[in-house]
């Protein structure tokens, strides 16, 4: 099955997520990506703030099934949603199950 997106940026409403969203939009205009997180209203605000021409996707970091659906739509999940000790395990599990590459920005050492 072909993925709908090349990258989904999960946690795009936070400080680092916004930097990533802005960077993608300014430097990779042909990239097929989406912005995702827990709050549709906040995602739409970021989309408007940076004039992003991308889809917004909602998935709660505590909901494995929602994360599976999210991971199943892309080649790569880039997560900027922390704390990673709380939110990364289920996302990693969803990515493994869907055959999706995963990366995050954690500096946490636990």
Question: Across the structure, where does each feature detected by a protein language model lie?
Answer:
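Structural motif
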Residues: 6, 75-76, 101
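ADP-ribose/adenylate-binding Rossmann-like module
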Residues: 83, 92-110
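N-terminal Rossmann NAD(P)H-binding glycine-rich loop of SDR-like oxidoreductase domains
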Residues: 6-27
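Short acidic/histidine-rich motifs immediately flanking catalytic phosphotransfer sites
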Residues: 50-53, 71-76, 97
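Short beta-strand element of Class I
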Residues: 32-34
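N-terminal Rossmann-fold cofactor-binding loop
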Residues: 36-40, 60-61
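Conserved Rossmann-fold cofactor-binding substructure of NAD(P)-dependent oxidoreductases
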Residues: 58-87
């Amino acid at each position: 099955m072909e993925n709908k997106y090349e990258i989904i940026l999960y946690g795009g409403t936070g400080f680092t997520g916004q930097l990533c969203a802005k960077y993608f939009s300014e430097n990779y205009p042909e990239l097929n990506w989406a912005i995702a997180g827990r709050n549709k209203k906040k995602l739409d605000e970021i989309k408007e703030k940076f004039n992003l021409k991308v889809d917004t996707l909602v998935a709660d970091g505590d909901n494995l099934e929602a994360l599976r659906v999210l991971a199943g739509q892309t080649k790569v999940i880039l997560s900027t949603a922390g704390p990673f000790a709380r939110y990364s395990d289920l996302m990693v599990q969803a990515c493994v199950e869907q055959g999706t590459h995963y990366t995050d920005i954690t500096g946490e050492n636990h």
